[in-house]
Amino acid sequence: MAAPIMLCDTAGMSNDRWLECRMHGPKGDIPYTVGGSDVAAIFGVSPWTTPLELWLIKKGRMKPPKKMNADQLAMGHMLEPIAAEWYARKSGNHVYQDTGLYQHADHPYALANFDRKYIRASDGDDG
């Protein structure tokens, strides 16, 4: 399997620009994208979005609903560095922030932002 393609660095990017990149890629040339946050909706287990709603949003036939879980999102962002530090201490792995927006090599609609990556202490390999 080919390595993911880094499309751009999102460090310092405005939230609106980041959302544009997530929706259509940094050049705006991807008709629709699927990210990690969409997977729960695709499988029908999201408490916020149904598969039909997601399809309508991706096709531009429905506006995304306002974030009903804004407090949970904010808390998650606040706790990310703490969780990363805890994992690093427990595992011995080196954890670092990654601000890239990546595209799957075989499926150009599949995009991802990795909040953190790690280097395994056992062999120095990326994880």
Whereabouts are the PLM-identified features?
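Charged, glycine-rich intrinsically disordered N-terminal tails and low-complexity linkers that flank
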Residues: M1-I82
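Active-site beta-strand-loop-beta-strand hairpin of nuclease catalytic cores
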Residues: K117-G127
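Short glycine-rich, polar/acidic loop-and-turn segments at beta strand-coil junctions
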Residues: K59-R61, E85, T99-L101
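Glycine-centered structural positions embedded in regular secondary structure
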Residues: M75-H77, G100, A112
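A short acidic/basic microdomain associated with nuclease active sites
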Residues: A88-P108, D115-K117
